[in-house]
UniProtKB/Swiss-Prot annotation:
Keywords: DNA-directed RNA polymerase, Nucleotidyltransferase, Transcription, Transferase. Belongs to the RNA polymerase alpha chain family. This is DNA-directed RNA polymerase subunit alpha. DNA-dependent RNA polymerase catalyzes the transcription of DNA into RNA using the four ribonucleoside triphosphates as substrates. It comes from Chlamydia abortus (strain DSM 27085 / S26/3). InterPro entries: DNA-dir_RNA_pol_insert, DNA-dir_RNA_pol_RpoA/D/Rpb3, DNA-dir_RpoA, RBP11-like, RNAP_asu_C, RNApol_insert_sf. Its EC number is 2.7.7.6. NCBIfam families: PRK05182.1-2, PRK05182.2-3, PRK05182.2-5, rpoA. Residues 1-259 are annotated as: Alpha N-terminal domain (alpha-NTD). Homodimer. The RNAP catalytic core consists of 2 alpha, 1 beta, 1 beta' and 1 omega subunit. When a sigma factor is associated with the core the holoenzyme is formed, which can initiate transcription. The N-terminal domain is essential for RNAP assembly and basal transcription, whereas the C-terminal domain is involved in interaction with transcriptional regulators and with upstream promoter elements.
Length: 376
């Protein structure tokens, strides 16, 4: 039986402070249907882990409404033609599949996620035909006369009429995920001449992700995740990403409930919270000025690391490459730096310090501090 009374302490994970959203080239700056999201830095391997999970959730997890069946005056089956309408029933069905309906089924809304019947009357007389040159297009907007559904493509043509007529049309709209074939849609109250359709519920059209290298300080062993999301306009890419994240969180929470020890992650050191002068005073300290064991001091000396600044800018894997530098010395140094509110692999670029000039810069800052204190 596991002892769950104490939390486990884990090293910090590098995480992005926020996710950056960018318009896609050629979109005119709009992010209504296409957008790219950039998250960095991530620990090595987490770019693909998150990218693949988000891609799958975006493609199969999001819900939206779609027309799952229809009936119309004079239509008995899907293989017939209708007198006075250019399109046959098969083409009308294909057009109905392209209808993009939008409605948020809020928890306290009247119908919620319930299937709805949308009934409409289409009346076309000779004057309507004359005004349109003899052919009157019936659009998606003409069929959405009730039900509270919006259409992203209201001018989308469903069929074209060539003679005066009156039609009663009923659309059955349901909420769902992904793509469902007509064979899998079961209607308990199906009408005699009601034709069931394949339904494309997902509002997400395309998802791609890419993983690139990025750096934290001098360490380049981190991931940058670039996620490209394209929707059909029923939800924005930003909404789609937010919804898919909640879906994944819901599923991961199942495994989090296992009765095991909890992990507490160490906090990353933020230089922004510290006074710049205070940080510099720590960075210019010599290695021999802090209380390290003789072994650790000698290891650093052999590696030609003389100041704290030279030490903290060094990535952890690089330290372990030095001769005789082992895990025990590494642990001691990390604990000592933590006491000083410092850590390995720090980004010192705000001080103009990099791996290529750290020795010179530490000497310059030390001279500057001594001069300021009247010890030059």
């Amino acid at each position: 039986m596991s002892d769950c009374s104490q939390n486990l302490l884990y090293d910090k994970f590098e995480l992005p402070e926020s996710v950056k959203m960018m318009a896609v080239e050629g979109s005119g700056g709009s992010v209504d249907k296409q957008a790219s999201f950039i998250a960095e830095p991530l620990e090595r391997g987490m770019g693909h882990t998150l990218g693949n999970a988000l891609r799958r959730a975006l493609l199969i997890g999001l819900e939206a409404p779609a027309i799952i069946s229809f009936s119309m005056t004079g239509v008995l089956h899907e293989y017939m033609a209708i007198n006075g309408i250019i399109e046959d029933v098969t083409n009308i069905i294909l057009n109905l599949k392209g209808a993009l309906l939008k409605k948020y089924p809020f928890q306290d809304s009247e119908n919620g996620r319930c299937t709805q019947l949308l009934k409409s009357k289409v009346s076309i007389d000779a004057s309507d035909l004359a005004a349109c040159g003899g052919q009157k297009a019936v659009t998606l907007a003409d069929l959405l006369q009730e039900g509270g559904f919006e259409s992203v493509n209201p001018d989308y043509v469903i069929f074209t009429v060539t003679q005066p007529m009156q039609l009663d049309i009923t659309l059955r709209v349901a909420f769902g995920r992904g793509y469902t074939t007509s064979e899998r849609i079961v209607l308990e109250d199906k009408g005699v001449n009601e034709i069931v359709l394949d339904a494309a519920f997902s509002p997400v059209v395309l998802v791609n992700y890419f993983v690139e290298d990025t750096r934290v300080g001098q360490d380049t062993d981190f991931d940058r995740l670039i996620l490209h999301v394209e929707t059909d306009g029923r939800v924005s890419p930003k909404e789609a990403l937010a919804f898919s994240t909640q879906i994944l969180t819901k599923h991961f929470s199942i495994f989090e409930k296992m009765d095991e020890k909890k992990i507490v992650f160490e906090e990353a050191i933020s230089l922004e919270k510290e006074n710049k002068d205070d940080i510099l005073h720590k960075l210019v300290l010599g290695i021999n000025e802090i209380e390290l064991s003789v072994r650790s001091t000698n290891c650093l000396s052999n590696a030609n690391i003389e100041t704290i600044g030279e030490l903290v800018i060094m990535p952890e894997p690089r330290l372990l490459q030095f001769r005789n530098f082992g895990k025990k010395s590494l642990c001691e140094i990390k604990n000592k730096l933590k006491e000083m509110k410092l850590e390995l692999g720090m980004d010192l670029s705000q001080f103009g310090v990099g791996l290529d000039n750290v020795k010179e810069k530490m000497k310059w800052y030390a001279d500057k501090i001594r001069s300021k204190n009247g010890k030059g």
